[in-house]
Curated annotation (Swiss-Prot):
Ammonium transporter involved in the maintenance of acid-base homeostasis. Transports ammonium and its related derivative methylammonium across the plasma membrane of epithelial cells likely contributing to renal transepithelial ammonia transport and ammonia metabolism. Postulated to primarily mediate an electroneutral bidirectional transport of NH3 ammonia species according to a mechanism that implies interaction of an NH4(+) ion with acidic residues of the pore entry followed by dissociation of NH4(+) into NH3 and H(+). It catalyses: NH4(+)(in) = NH4(+)(out); methylamine(out) = methylamine(in); CO2(out) = CO2(in). This is Ammonium transporter Rh type C. It is a multi-pass membrane protein. It is found in: Cell membrane; Apical cell membrane. It holds the Pfam family Ammonium_transp. The gene is RHCG. GO terms for molecular function: ammonium channel activity; ankyrin binding; carbon dioxide transmembrane transporter activity; identical protein binding. Homotrimer. N-glycosylated.
């Protein structure tokens, strides 16, 4: 079967069409929040407020940190593949730029609709970044195996499903999920894993050599890890209530991440017969504590509780990279490029369970009467709302998230299997040159039907060329 990866018309038309639609929808539906509107001046005077009381000054530092995580952290974390750095950063940039626009609309229709208009302020921007973070998680599962058009389509559907799932959890079930262990990480991970299972490639071994990293690519990926690790306390506390909740969320995340690093290093060394460290574990498993503490981050988890979560997740995540990822690929045909099940999936489920237990154990002694009302809205839509009820609904939220991710992933995966999206052939996966103009001599794209094809220059010593494989002739690349 021939694969046409020439996107000269398909990609420009797709990008332009989507952006024109965004412009029209924003023109019809989107307006500034009153704190971003010019009428803020009269509002400020009427209520005797200062400019510093504008929500922008409270939320913008957190927004900056979350924004860096989405575009720099996730982007560079996926540059570990030796020949897929352009695509990892570039396609992450593309899907995030489209995703934040669509997320502002979808989340606005569910949460911020006033007099038929979506009002946009700095908190909307943070929530849109959260939504896109879930898409970046799913991108890790299909990394190297899909075209940019497929990624845009996946982003469109995933953002839509994310907004629906978020509305069900936060508005209908009254779930607390400040750091998004369920809504962001669990949903994104199992949506992405389901999509990659539907897109299973039987002959992916033909691109096996490109799935390895080299010294430089691992260093770039470590940059992404460090940005994510440093800014994760802002991520988990960005939309918490001002004051003690936000303060507590940052402290809990800080502690969990620190503990996770030590246990990840310990297990990585213990699993190697000579006690050496695996860079894959250090890049990924060290972040699992930030994922797992997300749901309970703003609760009275206590610093030692956060340390325990990080301790446990560092062990589980590292073991997952060593044993679970190969098992999923060999037995269940789930080709998880970045190991998102170990960094986001399992830690996300752990986070959901920890959040349920922590909520169910909330008491007057720990929170105080006003603290319970403030933290869990116990005087909200149901007068009989108790801590145990909150715990049960936290579990319901986790189950709903898993169901939405699996069902949505199946549907979107079937759509992405259609043959005209410009996806790469099996022997040309994990290769930048399929979609990017490369420096001379850096292309290893294999075109077996062209007997005159020769590399454009000498190979780069640090990036070994991939030799043609016997099975490649059955799946040619049509330029």
């Amino acid at each position: 079967m021939a694969w046409n990866t020439n996107l000269r018309w398909r990609l420009p038309l797709t990008c332009l069409l989507l952006q024109v639609i965004m412009v029209i929808l924003f023109g019809v539906f989107v307006r500034y929040d009153f704190e971003a509107d010019a009428h803020w001046w009269s509002e400020r005077t009427h209520k005797n407020l200062s400019d510093m009381e504008n929500e922008f000054y409270y939320r913008y530092p957190s927004f900056q940190d979350v924004h860096v995580m989405v575009f720099v952290g996730f982007g560079f974390l996926m540059t570990f593949l030796q020949r897929y750095g352009f695509s990892a950063v570039g396609f992450n940039f593309l899907l995030a730029a489209f995703g934040i626009q669509w997320a502002l609309l979808m989340q606005g229709w569910f949460h911020f609709l006033q007099d038929r208009y979506i009002v946009v302020g700095v908190e909307n921007l943070i929530n849109a970044d959260f939504c896109v973070a879930s898409v970046c998680v799913a991108f890790g599962a299909v990394l190297g195996k899909v075209s940019p058009i497929q990624l845009l389509i996946m982003t469109f559907f995933q953002v839509t499903l994310f907004a629906v799932n978020e509305f069900i959890l936060l508005n209908l079930l009254k779930v607390k999920d400040a750091g998004g262990s369920m809504t962001i990480h669990t949903f994104g991970a199992y949506f992405g894993l389901t999509v990659t299972r539907i897109l299973y490639r039987r002959n992916l071994e033909q691109s096996k050599e490109r799935q390895n990293s080299v010294y430089q690519s691992d260093l770039f990926a470590m940059i992404g890890t460090l940005f994510l690790w440093m800014y994760w306390p802002s991520f988990n506390s960005a939309i918490s209530y001002h004051g003690d909740s936000q303060h507590r969320a940052a402290i809990n995340t800080y502690c969990s991440l620190a503990a996770c690093v030590l246990t990840s290093v310990a297990i990585s060394s213990a699993l190697h017969k000579k006690g050496k460290l695996d860079m894959v574990h250090i890049q990924n498993a060290t972040l699992a504590g930030g994922v797992a503490v997300g749901t309970a981050a703003e609760m009275m988890l206590m610093p030692y509780g956060a340390l325990i979560i990080g301790f446990v997740c560092g062990i589980i995540s590292t073991l997952g990279f060593v044993y679970l990822t190969p098992f999923l690929e060999s037995r269940l045909h789930i080709q998880d490029t970045c190991g998102i099940n170990n960094l986001h999936g399992i830690p996300g489920i752990i986070g959901g369970i920890v959040g349920a237990v922590t909520a169910a154990s909330a008491s007057l002694e720990v929170y105080g009467k006003e603290g319970l009302v403030h933290s869990f809205d116990f005087q909200g839509f149901n007068g009989d709302w108790t801590a145990r009820t909150q715990g049960k609904f936290q579990i319901y939220g986790l189950l709903v998230t898993l169901a939405m991710a699996l069902m949505g992933g199946i549907i979107v995966g079937l759509i992405l299997r259609l043959p005209f999206w410009g996806q790469p052939s099996d022997e040309n996966c994990f290769e930048d040159a399929v979609y990017w103009e490369m420096p001379e001599g850096n292309s290893t794209v294999y075109i077996p039907e062209d007997p005159t094809f020769k590399p454009s220059g000498p190979s780069v010593p640090s990036v070994p060329m991939v030799s043609p494989l016997p099975m490649a002739s059955s799946v040619p690349l049509v330029p």
